[in-house]
């Protein structure tokens, strides 16, 4: 009896490990579930509970935890989890990059440019827009979307069968993040560029004025003013537009000759 229970526990642990490998990257990437919000043992327990909740098989169907057959399955599940984490984190990375661009242009991250080793890692505007995107995402059913994507991924890529996530398209992910962030930041960047031109002309007529010192204050005020006008009507809709839905997941599993573009 005790020997049977011992082997049964091994199967349960194997199912939890496979589920953890797919769900954990999503928790690591999403800003409202990462280590800044959940940390340590509580987060691991929640990951396992979520993984077992969406697990598509009986808990005793997984191979034994210490068997060689577990190695390729864990690697496959981890690859699928990284892909899902990147797709679900897409709007948050765009908003984070948007905040970094704005803060860089207004001079808030000047210390990082002068001394990268001791400068700040993340600007305040980037953190704010990242959390703002998380609020918009959660308010519009983001957790339901996350669970739908997980369920759909198990339908398309069964953990007990061989499947290959299409990881090469993720290599263009940084380009697409930068592209969307630059498009969203362009109104603010354009106004800040014009303000620098006017300050440069003013310094020509008033050489005794320190245009650089004044520009930091002026550009910060202008950036905040433009964001007040630009924030509400544009950014929430773009967070929802960039949010990944379960209906688009089928194209992210490997097919020869297929192309993948995030819009």
Curated annotation (Swiss-Prot):
* Record's function text: Involved in a secretory pathway responsible for the surface presentation of determinants needed for the entry of Salmonella species into mammalian cells.
Could you tell me the membrane topology recorded for this protein? Multi-pass membrane protein
One family name in Pfam for this protein: Bac_export_1
Which coarse location class describes where this protein primarily resides? membrane
Q: State the PANTHER family in the record.
A: FLAGELLAR BIOSYNTHETIC PROTEIN FLIR (PTHR30065), SURFACE PRESENTATION OF ANTIGENS PROTEIN SPAR (PTHR30065:SF1)
Please report the name of this protein according to its UniProt entry.
Surface presentation of antigens protein SpaR
- List where the protein spans the membrane: 12-32, 46-66, 82-102, 127-147, 182-202, 211-231
Similarity annotation:
Belongs to the FliR/MopE/SpaR family.
GO biological process assignments: protein targeting
Q: Which domain of life is it from?
A: Bacteria
Where does the record say this protein resides?
A: Cell membrane
What broad taxonomic lineage does this protein's source fall under? Bacteria, Pseudomonadati, Pseudomonadota, Gammaproteobacteria, Enterobacterales
GO CC, one annotated term: plasma membrane
């Amino acid at each position: 009896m005790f020997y049977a229970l011992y082997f049964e526990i091994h199967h349960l642990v194997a199912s939890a490990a496979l589920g953890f490998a797919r769900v954990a990257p999503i928790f690591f990437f999403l800003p409202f579930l990462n280590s800044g919000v959940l940390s340590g043992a509580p987060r691991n327990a929640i990951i396992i509970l979520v993984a077992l909740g969406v697990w598509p098989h009986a808990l005793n169907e997984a191979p034994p935890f210490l068997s060689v057959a577990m190695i390729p399955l864990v690697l496959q599940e981890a690859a699928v989890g990284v892909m899902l984490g990147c797709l679900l984190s897409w709007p948050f990375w765009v908003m984070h990059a948007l905040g970094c661009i704005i803060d860089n242009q207004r001079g808030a991250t000047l210390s990082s440019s002068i001394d990268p080793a001791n400068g700040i890692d993340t600007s305040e505007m980037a953190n704010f827009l990242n959390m703002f995107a998380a609020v918009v995402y959660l308010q519009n059913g983001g957790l339901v979307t996350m669970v739908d994507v997980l369920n759909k991924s198990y339908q398309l890529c069964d953990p007990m069968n061989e499947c290959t996530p299409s990881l090469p398209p993720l290599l263009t992910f940084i380009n697409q993040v930068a592209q969307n962030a630059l498009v969203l930041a362009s109104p603010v960047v354009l106004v800040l560029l014009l303000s620098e031109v006017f300050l440069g002309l003013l310094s020509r007529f008033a050489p005794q004025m320190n245009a650089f010192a004044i520009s930091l204050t002026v550009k910060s005020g202008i950036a905040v003013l433009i964001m007040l006008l630009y924030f509400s009507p544009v950014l929430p809709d773009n967070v929802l537009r960039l949010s990944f839905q379960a209906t688009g997941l089928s194209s992210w599993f490997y097919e020869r000759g297929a192309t993948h573009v995030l819009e």
